[in-house]
Each structure stands twice: as C-alpha cells, then as structure tokens.
Amino acid sequence: MALSTDTTTPCLRPARAPTPLEVEEVVSLRGLEQLQGEWRWLWTRCPTATTFQRPEWLLPWFRSFGASFSSQPPWVITLRSEGRLVGLAPLAIREENGGRVVRLLGEGSAEHLDVLMDPLLAPHGVRLLFDWLALNGERWDTCVFEQLRESSPLLHKPTPEGWGDRTETREPCPRTGLHHYRRILWHGPERKV
C-alpha cells in the first residue's frame, strides 16, 4: 500500500484483523488462584463489572461454599487473545432434579453475577462461550444464569440453533431497585429448574 506524501491526505495503514480467541478450561481451585492477576486486570477492563466478579470475592466464596454448591470441580471457561485473558465465565455444574445444571459461581450470595468479557469482544466472546457449551453438551442438560443485570452480555446473545431459551424477570435488588434477570438455556427436552 502506498502512502501519500500529501500532508492533507490522512496516512493509511493496513487494518489488522482481530485475532482468533482461544478457549481454555480451568477445573480446579489452584488453577483459579493462578489466574488472579490476569483476572483482576480483566475486571478493570469491564466497566459494568461488580465486586462479586472479582477474584477477591469469588475465590473465598468457592473455598467456603464450593463443595456444597457442586460436587464437581469448577468449570471456568477462559478466552484469550494473543495470550491475554479477555473473557472469563466462572461456572460450575450441579446435580439438580435429576439433571446437570450449569450455573455461575457465587449464586445465592451475590446480587449481580455475570461473565467478564472485554467490552470490545463481548458479543463475539459470549457467542464463543455458547459454542463451547454446545461442544460440551454431553456434560450438562440446562444452563441457568441467575441474578443478571439488564446489561449482561449473557442476556442478549442468540443461542445456538436447536437450543431452548427462556428469560425471566426476577425480584428487584433491594438496595438499587433494579431488576435481576434469569436466563435458562437447554438442549434436548426442557427440564424443570
């Protein structure tokens, strides 16, 4: 590409295509602890992130309640771009009513839960997360994402073809008066949750 020597013409630089995102799974408390520095950095990049998404809150929560929350290890999905952490979905799979339910870590004792996604990559990142869940569909029956705010990227991304999808408005937060939302996703027959 030739650059103009005319100073009134803006210089043109080749556009750089976004790099593909890499998906990794973290399935142990130790693995989560090793992510703390990157996790904090990602948290600072997300303008709508809450205290309940910080490692300083979720790691002690998991140490205290993880075993009673799920008999299985955590199932945290991370997204990386050029080696940098750009997405984190802190999940666990629980046995409920004879089914396997994917839930966000921290549920039950936090007001606002969500995934952390770099704002520039959030729509693509959530799509990749849903694709990853679809690829691992033999591990779960239903996803239930509770205590989501209206701005949650989990609420607004279409699901893969063939999935069931229901969003419900929940009780408002007692401190802010803002409503929480619950999104339920499933593949195969719908189960009661």
Language model features with spans:
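N-acyltransferase acceptor-side catalytic subdomain
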Residues: 1-193
